[in-house]
């Protein structure tokens, strides 16, 4: 491969400058501010601050409400990732077949990804609204007392479905691309040997999708941590009784609603550390089981 050379030595730095500026402004600067404020105790108006060392972290880690948010986040992340990836893989497998109008169907499946999180949340809230929602009416007709604004389990189920629906389109694109990259000769050879559809999928298709699945696992984990804030805020507001208050929503609630800036900053630092550690763990241990050839 021929080495790429630039006629001007300064040009590469100009090309990198926009990305460097964005990274510094929208990541390093906010992260440094959060780390600084996590060691301070400020009043609600930010007029006075006191250095308290690790007091904010100690208070957060000993707070039962924070530990409850950790449990809620784990349940929410696992359910959202499994549902979004499972349904996307099922749809991608169906769309990979040569059928009439497959381009049209694929386009329809991609559209939900363009919907804003808050809009997606309001859409599902309207569908399952206890007073006027279509599905809520059907559930009541079948004897199910549906009210996600009062029942914590129902609220969790609703935000999981809304968050997974939003992410299915993204996963679908990558699974379709992964399926199209699998040589058809392998599947045809297995079919000739007498392997049925389910056996061909689990012994040939699914192992060859391991790189794609691993990548989507990391992406969906980060998505469930951060990008679902708008859905939870629009649908449940963290309720009822903190049943859907995830870590990122508790950061917002304590910082912007309760104006406890020190505690909120400490929580954001802990959340950042959790995501970094979890991602590193996935790349360090899970990736060992992924075969790229």
From Swiss-Prot:
Limits of the ABC transmembrane type-1 domain: 66-282
Keyword set includes Cell inner membrane: yes
Cellular component aspect of the GO annotation: plasma membrane
Compartments where located: Cell inner membrane
Gene Ontology biological process: transmembrane transport
Function: Part of the ABC transporter complex UgpBAEC involved in sn-glycerol-3-phosphate (G3P) import. Probably responsible for the translocation of the substrate across the membrane.
Subunit structure: The complex is composed of two ATP-binding proteins (UgpC), two transmembrane proteins (UgpA and UgpE) and a solute-binding protein (UgpB).
NCBIfam families on file: PRK10561.1 (NF007852)
Record-linked PANTHER family: BLL4140 PROTEIN, SN-GLYCEROL-3-PHOSPHATE TRANSPORT SYSTEM PERMEASE PROTEIN UGPA
Protein's name in the database: sn-glycerol-3-phosphate transport system permease protein UgpA
Chain's gene name: ugpA
């Amino acid at each position: 491969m021929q080495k790429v050379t630039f006629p001007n030595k300064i040009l590469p730095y100009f090309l990198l400058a926009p990305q460097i500026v964005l990274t510094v402004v929208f990541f390093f600067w906010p992260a440094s501010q959060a780390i600084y404020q996590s060691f301070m105790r400020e009043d609600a108006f930010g007029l006075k601050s006191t250095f308290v060392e690790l007091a904010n972290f100690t208070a957060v880690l000993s707070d039962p409400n924070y530990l409850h948010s950790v449990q809620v986040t784990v349940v929410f992340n696992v359910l959202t990732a499994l549902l979004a990836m499972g349904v996307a893989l099922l749809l991608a497998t169906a769309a990979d077949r040569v059928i009439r109008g497959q381009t049209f169907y694929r386009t329809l499946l991609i559209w939900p990804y363009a919907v804003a999180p808050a809009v997606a949340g309001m859409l599902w809230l309207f569908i399952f609204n206890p007073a006027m929602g279509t599905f809520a009416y059907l559930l009541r007709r079948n004897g199910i007392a549906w009210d996600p604004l009062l029942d914590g389990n129902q609220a969790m189920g609703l935000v999981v479905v809304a968050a997974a629906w939003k992410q299915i389109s993204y996963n679908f694109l990558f699974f379709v691309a992964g399926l199209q990259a699998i040589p058809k000769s392998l599947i045809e050879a297995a079919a000739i040997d007498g392997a049925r559809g389910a056996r061909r999928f689990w012994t040939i298709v699914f192992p060859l999708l391991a790189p794609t699945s691993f990548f989507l696992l990391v992406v969906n984990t980060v998505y469930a941590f951060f990008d679902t804030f708008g859905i939870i805020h629009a649908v449940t507001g963290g309720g009822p009784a903190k049943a859907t208050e995830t870590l990122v929503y508790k950061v917002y609630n304590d910082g912007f609603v309760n104006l406890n800036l020190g505690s909120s900053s400490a929580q954001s630092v802990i959340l950042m550390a959790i995501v970094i550690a979890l991602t590193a763990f996935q790349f360090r241990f899970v990736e060992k089981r992924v075969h790229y050839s």
